[in-house]
Structure formats: C-alpha cells, structure tokens
C-alpha cells in the first residue's frame, strides 16, 4: 500500500524489498487504503509511510474474526517471510547512504588486490558489479537507487560497500 504521495523512501524501499522477495507482489492504489493509512498519511499528519502486508486486510474471509489466528491463517512460513521482508526494509533504511568515489576516473583495482589475477577465483560478474557500482558513486545516488540501477537487491551490496570503504575507494557523503 503506497503512501499518499507514493514517492517516499518507504514507498521505494517497500517496492524494492517486495520485488526481490516476492516477484508476484501486488501494488494497491492509495485509494484502497485502510484506516491506519487514512490516519497516518492524512493532511496535517502526513507521515511518509507505505504498508507492507502479506494479504490485504478485508480480502480474506477470516479477517477480524476468531479464525484470524496463528492456527488457521498465519503460518510459520508466512510469518517468517513477513519478518524477513520487514527486516530487510529496515536494514535498507538504516544503510541507505550516498557514496562518492575517492579518485578521479576508474580506480586501479589491481594494486589494491581487488582485481582478479590468474590465481584468484573471483567470478567475472563480481568484478563487473564492483566496477558498475563504483561508476554510480557520484555522491548523488543513494544505495537503494544504485541497487535499482544495477538491478540487484540492496542487501547484496552491503559487503561490497564495506570492502570499498575499507580500501578508501568510496566514502559516505554526509
């Protein structure tokens, strides 16, 4: 469920997480909102929230009945899937920064031990991802924006960010 404006960080994060955890997810219109969204996103309050849900309220017969419980409706697998979607969303919000490359032009990766040699087993696609990531670190794009441009889940970039920061190839833009 999008926020009233539909373009907040929570909207972007929710779509990104669901794209990678449930490719068949459904995007509802703001006009399909429930009472929480009506209150939190109302003019004058305008909290920029989007809603992530496994099944939309009111769209299953057990909704708001005694059967809407941990036995009949909510399964351990469903609860775990919801947990991981929300955890990933919170991680993205916490780690979403802008990064800037610290050198002019493409950095020389070999001297930093980051470019594969004949004796290393780094897959070529990892090198391509690293170089493409660096090319987008202009200080203007956030991590989630870069992930979207690279068509990868944001969480698959966390180790790369740490590696490049540790080698002082990129830094966070404050």
Which role does the model predict for each range below?
Residues 1-174:
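Secretory-pathway/membrane protein signature
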């Amino acid at each position: 469920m999008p926020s009233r404006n539909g373009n907040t960080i929570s909207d972007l994060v929710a779509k990104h997480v669901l794209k990678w955890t449930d490719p068949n997810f459904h995007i509802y219109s703001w006009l399909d909102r429930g009472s929480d969204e009506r209150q939190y996103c109302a003019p004058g309050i305008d909290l920029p929230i989007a809603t992530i849900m496994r099944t939309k309220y009111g769209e299953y017969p057990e909704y708001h009945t005694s059967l809407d419980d941990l036995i009949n409706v909510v399964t351990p697998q469903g609860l775990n899937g919801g947990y991981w979607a929300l955890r990933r969303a919170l991680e993205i919000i916490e780690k979403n920064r802008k990064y800037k490359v610290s050198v002019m032009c493409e950095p020389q990766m070999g001297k930093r031990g980051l470019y594969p040699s004949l004796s290393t087993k780094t897959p070529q696609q990892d090198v391509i991802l690293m170089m493409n990531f660096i090319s987008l670190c202009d200080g203007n794009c956030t991590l989630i924006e870069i992930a979207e441009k690279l068509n990868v889940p944001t969480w698959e970039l966390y180790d790369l960010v740490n590696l490049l920061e540790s080698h002082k190839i990129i830094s966070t833009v404050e």
